[in-house]
Amino acid sequence: MARRVFFSFHYQNDINRSMTVRNSWVTQGKEAVGFIDKADFEQIKRQGDNAVHRWIDKQLEGTSVTVVLIGAETLNRPFVQYEICKSLERGNALIGVKIHAIKDMRTLRVSCSGNTHSIIGYYNNKLPAYFDNLCDGIYDYVFDDGYNNLGVWIESAAKKHGK
């Protein structure tokens, strides 16, 4: 059975780069969740943050690994931070994949790399929780050959969590 993986990304800025990663994943017979059509997302978003949170929670069901596709602003986005926190709560393995060097399909440009030492939340004692301290690995999709290695990274992280 294919591993069910949740992909988290900054929709507005990185949808095209994210689709490149997603398509490489599903063409290899894997199941990807966390992707939504823009019109559907806008409809959910109009219903408010709670509706978006419910959608995210539903998408996370049955997943064992969360892959955060890191663009320039990804880790600062509230919904991405929510996805990361909920993934950790459910015990998902967590990896980061930098996607800044993937050319955007529309503009054919690359973007800036996001800072992986970003605060994505706070512990109960108000100390900051940094993404790079919480994840099981950070990779670069282009420079680390993500097309061929994404599955290896995901399986390695899953095994660390006994999944």
Region annotations inferred by a language model:
Residues 1-62, 143, 147-163:
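Conserved N-terminal substructure of TIR/SEFIR domains
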Residues 4-6, 105-163:
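C-terminal interaction surface of TIR/SEFIR-family domains
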Residues 14, 40-47, 70-71, 101-107, ...:
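Low-complexity, flexible helical/coil segments
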Residues 17-18, 78-79, 106:
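Short glycine-/acidic-enriched loop or helix-start segments at secondary-structure transitions
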Residues 20-23, 81-84, 109-111:
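Short, glycine/charged-enriched secondary-structure capping and boundary segments
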Residues 59-85, 93-103:
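Conserved beta-strand-loop-alpha-helix hinge of the TIR/SEFIR fold
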